[in-house]
């Protein structure tokens, strides 16, 4: 096992959808003068803004974000490609004497980036000889956000309702106007529109389906993170919203160590 103190440091903010990851990450990044690496499988796509809950223009102006709007909707982007590209960005951020903040809900992307999971590609030059936490490529502080299940589901439902208020229907129309079975069309918040555009059900049903699929996804995310990242430190979203200093102090201590 290699000494973690000799490795580049990264801070990870993870958790289920609608748990408040992005807001917390921006606060931390501003406090420690850092940059954010988005490890979201769908925020990479231009034009998929509302359904993927991308940071606002104001938030993007406050803190530099990476891996937002880097692909067209008809392009694919694998976990391997993300890990390859993100490791270059981590090196660049670290060279500025900053700690990269990795933020998102894709456990598979995160495992691949950190080196916890081996990708089945014999020619893959970035996979460590041994995979697993003990052979992780970075000295990582993993922070998980969660809250009581009913409160999380309420947050999800409210987010979906805001999506419709902001114009998610137009984004979905633009996406499905393009022919092809793209990876981007599999994103929750968009894939549920397929039946609507096929005249199989109305918009109220689309909203119901997005809420249902988002809740199910959040449950799977929690299971995945808790099973695959035993060293993740968990905090309640409500507690952190009221007192973000708890996390900020933890990150500052990690930065100094």
Curated annotation (Swiss-Prot):
Enzyme class: transferase
Entries under InterPro entries matching the protein: Dimethylallyltransferase (IPR039657), IPT (IPR018022), P-loop_NTPase (IPR027417)
Chain residues that bind substrate: 17-22
EC numbers: 2.5.1.75
One example of a Gene Ontology biological process annotation: tRNA modification
Residues given in the record as ATP binding sites: 15-22
Swiss-Prot/TrEMBL cofactor(s): Mg(2+)
Reaction(s) this enzyme catalyzes, per UniProt: adenosine(37) in tRNA + dimethylallyl diphosphate = N(6)-dimethylallyladenosine(37) in tRNA + diphosphate
Pfam families the record matches: IPPT
Xref: HAMAP family: IPP_trans
Role, per record: Catalyzes the transfer of a dimethylallyl group onto the adenine at position 37 in tRNAs that read codons beginning with uridine, leading to the formation of N6-(dimethylallyl)adenosine (i(6)A).
Complex and partners: Monomer.
Protein name, as recorded: tRNA dimethylallyltransferase
Organism for this UniProt entry: Oenococcus oeni (strain ATCC BAA-331 / PSU-1)
Lineage of the species this protein comes from: Bacteria, Bacillati, Bacillota, Bacilli, Lactobacillales
Gene name of this polypeptide: miaA
């Amino acid at each position: 096992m290699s000494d973690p103190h000799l490795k580049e440091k990264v801070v990870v903010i993870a958790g289920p959808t609608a748990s408040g990851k992005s807001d917390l990450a921006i606060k931390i990044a501003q406090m420690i003068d850092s940059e954010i690496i988005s490890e979201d499988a769908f925020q990479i796509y231009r034009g998929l803004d509302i359904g993927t809950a991308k940071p606002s223009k104001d938030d993007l102006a406050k803190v530099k974000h990476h891996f937002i709007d880097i692909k067209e909707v008809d392009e694919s982007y694998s976990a391997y490609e993300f890990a390859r590209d993100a490791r270059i960005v981590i090196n660049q951020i670290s060279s500025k004497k900053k700690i990269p903040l990795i933020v998102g809900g894709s456990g598979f992307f995160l495992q691949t980036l950190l080196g916890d999971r081996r990708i089945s590609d014999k020619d893959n030059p970035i996979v460590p000889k041994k995979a697993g936490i003990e052979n992780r490529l970075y000295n990582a502080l993993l922070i998980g956000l969660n809250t009581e299940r009913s409160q999380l589901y309420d947050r999800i439902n409210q987010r979906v309702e805001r999506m419709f208020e902001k114009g998610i229907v137009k984004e979905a129309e633009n996406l499905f106007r393009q022919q092809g079975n793209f990876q981007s069309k599999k994103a929750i918040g968009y894939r549920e529109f397929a039946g609507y555009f096929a005249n199989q059900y109305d918009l109220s049903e689309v909203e119901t389906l997005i809420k249902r699929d988002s809740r199910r996804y959040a449950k799977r995310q929690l299971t995945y993170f808790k099973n695959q990242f035993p060293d993740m430190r968990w905090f309640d979203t409500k507690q952190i919203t009221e007192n973000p200093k708890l996390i900020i102090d933890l990150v500052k201590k990690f930065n100094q160590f």
